[in-house]
Each structure stands twice: as structure tokens, then as C-alpha cells.
Amino acid sequence: MAVWDRLKDQAKALQQGQAGHGASGGHGGGHGAPRSGGGGKAQLIGLFKTQLGSLKNELKSGAYRDASMAMCALVAAADGQVDASERQQVESMILSNDVLQNFPPEQLRQRFSKHVDQLTANFQHGKAEAMQEIAKAAKKPTEARAVIQTGMVIAGADGHFSQAEAQVLREACAALGLSPAEFQL
């Protein structure tokens, strides 16, 4: 728990440092504005990558693996579709993610593909299935936060958070019992 508290303090310090740069705290106001600036979000994504890396040895459970793959698929399909190049790009990010290297690549690929296929066949049904998988990580707060951070790293990889990506991340926070404000959503 001490590791998470230290990392959370680092995130708060970063948030406070960004407060003067026009990103109005993260909750409320101008809905899309904080997501398009890049600078503050890019630093936050970098911090999340660092935090996830420092927790690598703790993030080895099947619940984290499955919830993370559901989260990645949900972020990829947030706009209701996933084309082949986007699917390949997200899959490459998953397979190169330091923390996710705790798991066999074929397991990750299989779980990610299952969720993407469900989401593209019937978005609402696939989303419900993905959220059920994500909610299973709520039992362990460190894993729950790591699932959201993993989703944010995937969503922020292109330097921009779409409204749809931010929305599914907020919904995942609710499924995990976490405050979206903790992640500047």
C-alpha cells in the first residue's frame, strides 16, 4: 500500500503543477478542453507508465490480465468501430507494454481479440461483457487503478483523448469504484 500512496502523491504533485497551465483541474468545465492540450496529459501518461512499471511484480493476476485486455479493447472500440490498422496498433502496444509482459503474448492477444470481436459485432453487448470483466479487478485497489492506467496509456498513445475514450474510461472507473477525478477524467 505504501508504494501506491507514494505514486498517488506523485500524481497529485503533477496535477497541481499543471493547474496553472489552463487544464482547469480535470473535473467539470469545458468537457473536451483538458484532453486536447497534450502537454499535461502527456506528462500524466508518462507518470502512469512509470507507476505501472514500478508495480510490475504485483500485477500478475489473471483478473488484472483479463480486465486490462477488456479495457484496451473498450478504449480501441470507444467510437463504435475498430479498423484493422487500429487493432494491430493497439495489439502492438499491448505486447510491448512492460507490465503486460508478465503474461504470455498469445493469452493477451486472445483475450483482446475476443473483446474487440464482441464490441464490433454488437457494441452494447460487447461493452457490457467488457465492463463485467473490468469490474472483477475491483477486489484489489492496486489492480483496479492499474487497469484504468493501462487504458489511459492506450488511449493517450496517439497524443489525444477522444470524448468517447474518456467516457469509457469514466465508466470503467465507476465499475471499479474509483473516482474519475483521480485520473483527471
Which stretches of residues belong to each language-model region?
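Small-residue-enriched hydrophobic alpha-helices in membranes
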Residues: 1-74, 84-185
